Swiss-Prot record:
An example Gene Ontology molecular-function term: pyridoxal phosphate binding
Assembly mode: Homodimer.
NCBIfam families: PRK09148.1
Keyword Transferase on entry: yes
GO biological process per UniProt: biosynthetic process
Name of the protein this chain belongs to: Putative aminotransferase AatC
């Protein structure tokens, strides 16, 4: 049978190669320290779990829910934006609950993309930013990920040389995988650019609450008039350690939110109602749960930066997110990130995410997730130190993928 058209358009999912190797090593008895997938290990706060258990006892909540999210949940998200960013949103027309931000992004692509539409997407970036539009028939044009003045000249060229004119610009700050953070001044320039060229802005703000200094990352919607052209996506997965609950939001421009809501109405009935009620309680909380999660990730970040640095693997301290973006040690860089990641599993019992999985501009890097405790992170550093010190004896039979390019 011939491969299906949409499946054929998708690039290989390179993370799966590392996952298979990791599973094989574990089956053979290896203790793999997994810094690869950004899958939080922290428990969901007990008060949120308790609310779920309470509400699930009511059989009325076992029926179909609302695709756009129950009213109380949408009001809670609007209230969060007002508290955190000073942004006023209408919960009826500017907020929709999604099954995680990933689903929201993919369905927004389905809602707004015509075959051949050009989308400006950072490289490297989280895969759904590009893949969602590829599956919807769009064309990706890669742009820089640095949120500074160097971002705009290539953007202007992309607009001039793209036929048709780009439909949308994707932003992701704090960035997954690079952990870079944007400023409000940068966002002001982005909105001015988008309005000048009549381009939609889609902002992924999944890591807004995971930051490690006294400057909370801003929302692009803080820019006056941003809702004229912008939708922003958030997630409860990292903020409240709720990845398996699948709860996120899209907020912003009424026309775009209406389009997403309509597409979703054909595809799902929303999250299980008790999950939505528990999420409402989380959003209406005093913020102490968020502060505790943030503090744990900061301690893990500091341990990783220190211990990996002593091991000979320099890891720049990320200012935000639950990830570090580290350049592959120079003697291994010629291998590319996929082969280096495989080596770490085989020789050091450590799993990381190869940078190539986030775009070709990431191939000199690996992403390290802060999803193991401090003891395990130090153990990973010791394993890597042993691997690096013995690499000259073990590398003679490793062939670089780049040698065949």
């Amino acid at each position: 049978m011939e491969e299906f058209h949409k499946v054929r358009r998708l690039p290989p999912y390179v993370f799966e190669q590392v996952n298979r190797l990791k599973a094989s090593a574990r089956a053979a008895g290896a203790d793999i320290i997994d810094l690869g997938m950004g899958n939080p290990d922290l428990p969901t706060p007990q008060s949120i779990v308790d609310k779920l258990c309470e509400v699930v006892q009511d059989p009325r909540t076992h029926r179909y829910s609302s695709s756009k999210g129950i009213p109380g949940l949408r009001r809670a998200q609007a209230a969060y934006y007002a508290r955190r960013f000073g942004v006023k949103l209408n919960p009826e027309t500017q907020v929709v609950a999604t099954l995680g931000s990933k689903e929201g992004f993919a369905n927004m692509a389905q809602a707004i993309t015509a075959p051949g539409d050009v989308v400006l997407c950072p490289n490297p970036t989280y895969p759904i930013h590009a893949f969602g539009f590829l599956m919807a028939g769009g064309v990706i044009r890669s742009i820089s990920v640095e949120p500074d003045e160097s971002f705009f000249p290539p953007l202007e060229r992309a607009v001039r040389h793209s036929i048709p004119k780009p439909l949308a610009l994707i932003l992701n700050y704090p960035s997954n995988p690079t952990a870079q953070v944007a400023t409000l001044d940068f966002y002001k320039d982005v909105i001015a650019f988008a309005k000048k060229h009549d381009i939609i802005v889609l902002s992924d703000l999944a890591y807004s609450e995971i930051y490690f200094d006294d400057a909370p990352p801003p929302s692009v919607l803080e820019v006056p008039g941003a809702t004229d052209v912008t939708v922003e996506f958030t997630s409860m997965s990292k903020t409240f350690s709720m990845p398996g609950w699948r709860m996120g939001f899209a907020v912003g421009n009424e026309r775009l939110i209406a389009a997403l809501t309509r597409v979703k109405s054909y595809l799902d009935y929303g999250a299980f109602t008790p999950i939505q009620v528990a999420a409402t309680q989380a959003l209406n909380g005093d913020g102490s749960d968020i502060a505790e999660v943030r503090a744990i990730y900061k301690r893990r970040r500091d341990v990783m930066v220190e211990s990996f640095g002593k091991a000979g693997f320099e890891v720049p301290p990320p200012p935000a997110t639950m990830f570090a973006w580290a350049k592959i040690p120079e003697k291994f860089r010629h291998l590319g990130s996929l082969e280096f990641s495989k080596l770490l599993v085989e020789k050091a019992d450590v799993a990381v995410a190869p940078g190539i999985g986030f775009g070709e501009q990431g191939d000199d890097y690996v992403r390290l997730a802060l999803v193991e405790n401090e003891h395990r992170i130090r153990q990973a550093a010791r394993n890597i130190k042993r691997f690096l010190s013995s690499a000259d004896e073990t590398m003679h039979n490793v062939i670089s993928l780049n040698a065949h390019r």
